[in-house]
């Protein structure tokens, strides 16, 4: 992306080398914003990044989306929060002794399947009770819906900006390789420390 040109130090054999000095500067700005935020959601749904997102979010008691961004997660908060509440209710129901629930075996199996499906999409945001103060995004081109919802609601974002990203779509952009799990893990650990 041409808008990333100021963050590129040089190009070698068709590979862009990002300017590490700018990465450090932008990381420090983002870290200050992260420390001020009380309600943070991490977003990264690509298969190689998903486990890193989950681990980092759990380490700092934040929320996360690492399987698929459900459309309207932020912009349709009233409906989504009802789904999350339903997931929590299902969890309580299934924790009870099957004999005391008053459900048949078939109904219990259906409820378990429903819970598994909802857990897959909403498990990382189960404790989210209101819209977040800040959203951390890894893989901007892949997480376009999350980026657009944050923009629509004026929710600040911290984004790892690879050479294929657009810095104009984020509040705090950290130039870094967002394809490498080691790079993502290193940057996010620095951010939350």
Task: Identify what each model region corresponds to.
Residues 1-134, 138-161, 165-177, 181-193:
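Ribosome large-subunit tunnel/peptidyl-transferase-proximal elements
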């Amino acid at each position: 992306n041409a808008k990333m040109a100021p963050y590129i130090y040089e190009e070698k054999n068709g590979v862009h080398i990002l300017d590490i000095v700018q990465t450090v500067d932008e990381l420090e700005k983002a870290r200050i914003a992260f420390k001020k935020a009380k309600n943070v959601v991490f977003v990264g749904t690509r298969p190689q990044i998903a486990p890193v997102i989950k681990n980092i979010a759990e380490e700092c008691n934040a929320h996360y989306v690492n399987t698929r961004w459900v459309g309207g997660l932020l912009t349709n908060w009233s409906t989504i929060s009802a789904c999350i509440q339903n997931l929590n209710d299902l969890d309580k129901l299934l924790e009870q002794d099957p004999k005391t629930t008053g459900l048949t075996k078939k109904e219990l199996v259906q409820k378990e399947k429903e819970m598994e499906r909802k857990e897959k999409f909403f498990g990382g945001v189960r404790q989210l009770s209101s819209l977040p103060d800040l959203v951390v995004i890894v893989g901007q081109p892949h997480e376009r819906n999350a980026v657009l919802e944050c923009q629509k609601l004026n929710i600040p974002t911290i984004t790892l900006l690879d050479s294929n990203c657009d810095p104009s779509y984020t509040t705090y952009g950290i130039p870094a390789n967002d394809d490498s799990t080691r790079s993502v893990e290193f940057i996010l650990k620095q951010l939350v420390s």
